[in-house]
């Protein structure tokens, strides 16, 4: 990371690329309302990307190898997990995907190398806002593993907002009006680009 020990991506570099491509490159594009984008280096959420129209959060997806796990009574992976997603059950480590926030803190902690690596990625939140009204952005289902995928989703979100948003309406209102599932489907599909 570029700002703290928990950073999982170069948030300054990604922010600059987003700024150059979409703020400078799209400066003549008229949107229904302002569109804020935030980039956070990890799931600790310090810069609150989920409270912006679109937020990108660094991820590190655990690469657990169950065949190597020895089911230690004092599991270092379990002890390290800050959200308690990792638990040894019946002699094997289990990671609850509904609890795991892909912070990557568990990676490399197993002395037997059952959690040696993790794939870096990006979680994208849409529809957040703060101020007089606030809304927590919702995460898109996939964790993206390439920067170009992230840039394409951002571009699709801007185009969707331009084409389907109403004048004076914030992106969160557009999502609420159209439905999250519908918007997610469009952002993950190929029709907008």
Q: Predicted segment positions?
A:
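Small-residue-enriched alpha-helical segments and adjacent helix-cap loops
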Residues: 1-74, 80, 94, 98-99
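Catalytic cores of large soluble enzymes that bind and process phosphate-bearing ligands
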Residues: 3-14, 142-149, 163, 172-175
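General structural feature for long, well-ordered alpha-helical segments within catalytic domains
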Residues: 10, 14-18, 22, 77, ...
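Flexible, glycine/charged-enriched surface loops at secondary-structure junctions
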Residues: 28-34, 89, 163-177, 193
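Short beta-strand elements
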Residues: 54-58, 122-130
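Iron-sulfur cluster-binding cysteine motifs and their immediate structural context
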Residues: 74-94, 101, 105-121
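A hydrophobic, small-residue-rich beta->alpha segment in the mid-to-C-terminal subdomain
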Residues: 120, 128-165
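C-terminal, charged low-complexity interaction regions
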Residues: 182-193
């Amino acid at each position: 990371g570029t700002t703290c020990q928990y950073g999982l991506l170069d948030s300054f570099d990604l922010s600059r690329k987003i700024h150059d491509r979409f703020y400078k490159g799209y400066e003549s594009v008229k949107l229904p309302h302002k569109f804020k984008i935030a980039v956070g280096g990890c799931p600790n959420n310090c810069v609150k990307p989920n409270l912006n129209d679109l937020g990108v959060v660094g991820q590190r997806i655990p690469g657990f190898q169950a065949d190597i796990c020895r089911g230690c009574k004092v599991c270092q992976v379990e002890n390290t997990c800050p959200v308690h997603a990792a638990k040894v059950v019946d002699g094997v480590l289990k990671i609850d995907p509904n609890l795991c926030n892909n912070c990557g803190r568990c990676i490399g902690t197993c002395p037997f190398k059952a959690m040696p690596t993790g794939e870096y990625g990006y979680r994208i939140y849409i529809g957040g806002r703060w101020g007089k009204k606030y809304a927590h952005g919702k995460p898109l289902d996939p964790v993206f593993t390439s920067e170009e995928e992230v840039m394409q989703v951002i571009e699709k979100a801007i185009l969707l907002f331009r084409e389907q948003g109403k004048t004076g309406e914030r992106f969160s209102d557009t999502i609420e009006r159209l439905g999250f599932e519908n918007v997610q489907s469009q952002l993950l599909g190929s029709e907008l680009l």
